[in-house]
Amino acid sequence: MRKFIALGATACTAVTLALPALAQEVVVIGHSAPLTGPQAANGKDNENGARMAVDELNKQGVVVAGKKVTFKLESQDDQADPKTGVQIAQILVDRNVVAVLGPYNSGVAIPASRVYNNAGVPLLPVASNPAITKQGFKNIFRIGASDAQLGGTMGEFATKELKAKTVAIIDDRSAYGQGIAEQFEESAKANGLEIIDTQFTNGQATDFLGILTALKAKNPDVIFFGGYASQAAPMVKQMRQRGLKAKLLGGDAICTADMGRVAGDAASIVYCSQGGTSLDRTAEGREFIKKYKDTYHIDMQVYAVNYYDGVKMLADAMTKAGTTTDKSKLIAQLAKEEYKGIAGSYSFDAEGNLKGAPTTVYVIRNGLPVPYVR
């Protein structure tokens, strides 16, 4: 009997050792952003945040429906160009990505979203133009604040905090710039600000002396710029050069480390809004800032943390939905997610907007955006 038991135990051990390892699956998440050109710093920042999350998930080990998942990020350069963004969308769809983070630019996100919608691919943009989520698509989940929230915040801030009476608006005519400028104008008027001039530029301009000379004659209390930091930085330097006394206001796209780095001391008159609460106000946020700098040896720009949260939320949704391949089930799960990330909580309304997205106003101090304190 003793011999039989011993043999039985040996046989059981052999069977155990012969059992196959847990099945593995590679899950590819797409990323679309400007990785070259004037906005490359923002695109790389977003990519860095997503890669941090991918690396952590792979080290941690995620099991979905009995399979160990290895995540991979497929990052593509859309050059902040709508036509290129549509081409990138088709490339990512053809590569069967499970979901896409981005695009960063509203002008890219609007046409590209149609490609992703037709393919049934979940899309998690930070692009803020309200038109993105007004198309009736069920696959879009905006992981940042919209222009209505960002522009609205600055209209109220200009009157209540800066005590401004008059404002001039400069619009870069991009989908982002136009959208946030329109939302700011609506809020400004509602708060009693007088719009004394509106000027237009384009996304490639760096010389604003003509516009600023015209505005100086009208002496606005504040200037709101609907556009990106790559233009706002030279603009604010030229404001000082022209002797304008106005403050420069803008949205999340000028609330970057590059704004302070390029504009230098001139950036001290910049006030900008970002979605979410300030990271340095929570232990998790401070840890993320440190971890980012330790990993990449640069300061984060704006949305790295949202992309980090976005990847982690996708993994959470896959686990709850029990699938990495059925995109319709993943979309259904994302629609009812209540995910707690580093930047805040993520849940979405029927259009795919972030519910109750908080906003924070920042100033540039010592080259970096810091929360405004009265």
Residue ranges and their predicted role:
Residues 11-12:
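Repetitive helical segments and hydrophobic/amphipathic motifs
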Residues 1-8, 23-374:
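Extracytosolic ligand-binding ectodomains
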Residues 15-16, 47:
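Residues in and immediately flanking transmembrane alpha helices
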Residues 17-23:
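Sec/Tat signal peptide C-region and signal peptidase I cleavage site
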